[in-house]
């Protein structure tokens, strides 16, 4: 019973996660997943983070805590089984380097597991499209309404802003859609 965050968030009503679920990840998307799962009947939900902190915004994390999400830090998933997830403890050095602590493997029981970890941007489009500019993180460079470095080409969502909440991505995408609509009206009215 393993799912990916994006699939779960698209239609959480079709998933039955059971009483106990684990979310692997501690970013904004993981907070969305955790809160949604609790609202859909999961009683025990734990979010696991590799590091000693939550990468989600303070706002998102505080609401997740209020809704009953438990956070477990410095754990690396080793294996997902039909009984849950085996994690190993991690030591975090001052420079942020993480190292496994041998002998600390432990099974955390779960009916379901949702993977909500950051994924790097897909570079297929940028690698094959001349003059489409990206920043150092591989995200599209745009203006405030999503126009890219190529006239008539727009970009939105995580490809521009990086990992954010679904609400933020949708709000920005609406702004971009309005700009695209305005551009299409200009082209339609031109002879």
Label every model-predicted segment.
Residues 1-18, 95-163:
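FAD-site-proximal beta/loop scaffold in flavoenzymes
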Residues 16-42:
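Rossmann-like NAD(P)H-binding beta-loop-alpha module
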Residues 26, 49-52, 158:
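Cofactor-binding loop segments of dinucleotide-utilizing enzymes, especially the Rossmann-like FAD-
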Residues 34-78, 189:
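Rossmann-like dinucleotide-binding cores of NAD(P)H-dependent redox enzymes
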Residues 78-82, 120-122:
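Feature captures the FAD/FMN-dependent oxidoreductase FAD-binding
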Residues 159-181:
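A conserved FAD-binding loop/helix module that cradles the flavin
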Residues 184-191:
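Residue-level detector of conserved catalytic or cofactor/ligand-binding positions
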